Design a protein with these regions (language model features):
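A short glycine-rich, His/Asp/Glu-containing loop-to-beta-strand
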Residues: 2-40, 46, 98
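Structural motif
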Residues: 11, 56-58, 65, 81
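Conserved hydrophobic/aromatic beta-strand scaffold that supports enzyme active sites
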Residues: 14, 27-29, 49, 65, ...
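Short acidic-glycine-tyrosine-enriched beta hairpin
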Residues: 20, 63-81
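Ligand-binding loop in jelly-roll beta-barrel domains
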Residues: 21, 78-105
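Glycine- and acidic-residue-biased ligand/ion/polar-headgroup-sensing regions
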Residues: 45-57, 62
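Short glycine-/acidic-enriched loop or helix-start segments at secondary-structure transitions
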Residues: 61, 69-70, 85-86, 107-108
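Acidic/histidine-enriched, glycine/proline-rich intrinsically disordered or flexible terminal extensions
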Residues: 109-149
């Protein structure tokens, strides 16, 4: 299985192959430059745990925003609208994200752009295809990358 992908301006490395866990969970290390923000979205079929290894990541929800620093984590239950934003001033933010049951790692293998880790591709996101594939695992995209909730 290929395990290194780019999506929405961040490099994702699938650490735990979901097929090796009987689809119980998958884990992804995400590396983001300052200012990179996901589209607002909902995971309808799985939970997400975001753990900051290095840098800072802000989790935006309808209840407000919380900034996480090295060693801190945030649990996102199924159905919670959210987006993630790398809010450090410089350098790379590294997070470990665990999805249970497996979900996002599967989506990355279907949709992520294959590219060497340190060479970001020129991404041309086919949002219609992304929404179709993410919808198959229960995800709902609520707006464009960088959009607000």
């Amino acid at each position: 299985m290929k395990n290194s992908f780019w999506l929405f301006g961040s490099h994702h490395y699938v650490i735990t192959d979901p097929h090796n866990t009987d689809l119980e969970y998958d884990q992804v290390e995400k590396r983001s430059k300052p200012g990179v923000k996901t589209p607002p979205h909902i995971h309808g079929g799985y939970t997400e745990l975001v753990y900051v290894i290095e840098g800072q990541m802000t989790v935006h929800t309808k209840k407000g925003s919380i900034t996480l620093y090295n060693g801190q984590y945030f649990f996102i239950p199924k159905g919670m609208p959210h987006s993630l934003e790398a809010t450090q001033k410089q350098g790379i933010t590294r997070t470990l994200q665990t999805f249970a049951p497996a979900g996002f790692g599967l989506l990355l293998t279907q949709f992520g752009t294959d590219s060497p880790e340190n060479i970001p591709p020129v991404e041309s996101i086919d949002m219609e295809l992304f929404e179709k594939l993410s919808g198959e695992i229960g995800d709902i995209t609520l707006g464009p990358p960088g959009g607000s909730l």
